[in-house]
Each structure stands twice: as C-alpha cells, then as structure tokens.
Amino acid sequence: MEKMELQKQVLLSYSVVYPDRHDKIEDLLANVPSNTAIELISYNLSKKVNQFIGEHDFDIWTPWIMKTRNDVKNPVGEYAQQYNLGNYALIDKYAMLLLISRLLTCYNGRNEELTEDDLSNLFLAYMLCCDERLAMNEKLPNNNMKAEEFVESYMPGCLKSNNIEAPRDYRLLMIKCYMLLIEFPKFNTRFAKYVDEFCKERDIPSAKYYLDEIFLTFMKMEEEDFSNCRMAIDENQKDACRFYDSLTLNPSHYQHDMDFLMMKEKPLIKTGPNIYNFMFMKMFLDKAYTGLLFDMKDALVKRGVLDPTMGYANLRSFLGEEFSERFFFYSLMKKCFGLNYVNYSGEELEKALGKGMPDYYLRRRNRIFVFECKDVQMAAKIKLSGDYETIKKQFLRSMSQIPRGMRKGVAVGKYDWQTFYFRRNGHFAGYFDHLVLSLKVCKPIF
C-alpha cells in the first residue's frame, strides 16, 4: 500500500472575515424567501458533491459573493489580499446543510426571486454556519500520530459528518430495488405475495411499472443539469407523486438538530404544486429504499396482510435477514467473484459444516476470505458524542450480536484454514473445498 499523507484544509468562516459584526442567523434569514433560498443552497450543495478533480470551490462561491452588497463582499476581498483563498475550503457540505436546516426553522413558504439583500443575508448566514462547523473539530489529527492515536483523534469528528461525506450512487439504489421487487420474489413465495398485494392495492399492473414510474422520473431530472435538485411531476403520475409525497418534509413541524434527523427522514420539500426539491441527494438515496418499504407496509396493512403496529418492524426484519444478508449479498458476491474464486454462501457452508459459519467464503489459490455481512446502525447520541471510548464500545457491542447461533465479530476473527474441513463422528473426513494441508492464510472481512 502506498504511503499516505494527511492533508488539512482551512475553512473560511464568519468570525475571521467579519470580526466586528454581530449578526444573528435567525434575524438574517427571517425575511429571505425560504423556498427560493433552499433551492439555491441545495443546488450549490449538489454542485459541490459533483465537483471534478481539479475544480475549485471558486466556481460555486464566486457567482454568489459577487451578487451581495459591498459591506458583505468587500471584507472578503480585503481578506483575500492577505491570504491565498486557493488554499481555503469555501463550500463545506455540512455547513450548507446547517444553512438549509436554519432556513427550515424560520420557513415562510415564499418563492420570490432573491434580491441583493437576500443573497447578502444568506451568505452571512452561511458564514455563521461555517463557524458552527469548525466548532465541531475538537481535536485535529496529525501525521506523527501512531495508528491508535490517529483513530482516536480522527474517528469521533469524522463520524459526525460521515453520512454527508460518504459517497452515494443512485445506480446502486436502482439495482437494489430491482433485485428486491423483481428478482427476489422469484425465489421467495412470501415476498412474492407481498409484492402482488402491493400492486393490487396501488392498482398498478406490475412491480416493474412501479420502478419505472419512480426512477425514470428521477433520472429525467438530471438530463439538462447533473446537479439539478428540482423535479416537476405531472399530476397524472399518481404513484410517483404518492411516493415522493411520502418523503416530503412539512416545514411547520421542523426542529433543528446537528444530525439533521428530520431532513434524513424526509429529504424533499415541496416548493410548488407537484414541484419537489431534493434538499440533499445523498439523504434521498439513503431514504428512498426505506421509503419504498414504508410504501409497501402501508399497502399491506390496508389489505390485512401485515399487523398495523409491528408491520414495518416485521417487514424490515424479514427483508434484512432473507433479502439483504442472504439473497442480495449472495447474488452480489457470486457475480463479483464467481468466475475467479472458489466460493460458497453461508447457507452452503452451514449445510456442509453446521451452524456458526460466516456469511460467505472465497478462496483464490492459497488465500481464504471469509465475509460477515452486517447492517449496523449507530444511535445519533452515540455518533455525535465525540467520545472515542463510547463509540468504540457501541461498535464492538453491535458487531457481537448473535445471528444464527454464533457471536458475529468475535467468532469471525478466530477462523483459520482448519475451520473448513468435514468431521464425521469426530474424525477427519476430508478438507472442505479440497484445501491442501499447508494452506494457512485466512482473512476475515466485515
């Protein structure tokens, strides 16, 4: 592995550019047209996410700052004469989301074009959000730290914005939804019944029709501009409207928090009749799959197939084990490694060797790779605690939950080449997958 070097970048913020100002963010945003402002900020945020290597934040930042009042842009110019802004981060994703969240807390539902004063106040509010963002960095890592020190310093702060910084790809979401609604029912009669009842309740011909309605509409949004966050849907597309309505936030009930929980739950906002704005595309991609499950749960409850109280929990639990950890994971591994590796699924291992096997087994030449697939969610209060020991303890506890008769995360670390051979009545009966006796390289992977 190549030697890597940690690089740090400075974020420009309100306190260094406007040391003599004392603006309050709620006063700055009180009269800014909320819908128009949210559309602008979410678009700039999308452009930041879609930046190419070599592009700089100037491309997003400059058109904005040039439309502000002199009392806003002149101090920036004076600061730029002293320091090279090319070394600064000018657009921060977390700070942009903070600004959207603040706009939602003082939402006024207005759609007028933004004036010079509006853009000025919006920029000042963003710079205040950059101060909030910087306050989250309690301890900065450096290149001289040992591995454990680096993790202890870096991970707590990194986790706070991990959902925002981690990459997402809508094409992967489409594949997962296709596997769920089209392929999985072919192998699972229980879920095939669920899909059939779902389609009947929605009065649609097939699951494929449903996917086409949702994802083709979504893809059309990006035909003209890949960073576009605004989508208009024809009122006759009832299923698409119903699906996106289920993911649309009601600003009158919004409460701000540093983890954006309500925005994650409802990542869209309506800025007009059948006009939807994706506040942050990554949040939508995280939520769309879960939103589809809520959609299905509601339909199945209406038809008496699922219990109204525990319907979603039961559906999620069933799909987590039968679809995510087995069918989808097995299919993914088989298609990625099936030609060049000896491979066996967890079910095949259990049939041959009994309970307590990993979820997947690969071998290439003299190397074994054993996989544990686990979908772990960490509570926001743990993730945002900033305490390394608290986070570490919760992570180890989550990875040691008991699935199918073994302690996951504990047992997987103890696998070695001798684990995979047959025993009959306690006696050696031949190595699983015909391993040679000298093979001793085994790598557990979560």
Where in this protein do the model-derived segments appear?
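Flexible loop/turn segments at secondary-structure boundaries
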Residues: 351-356, 377-380, 441-445
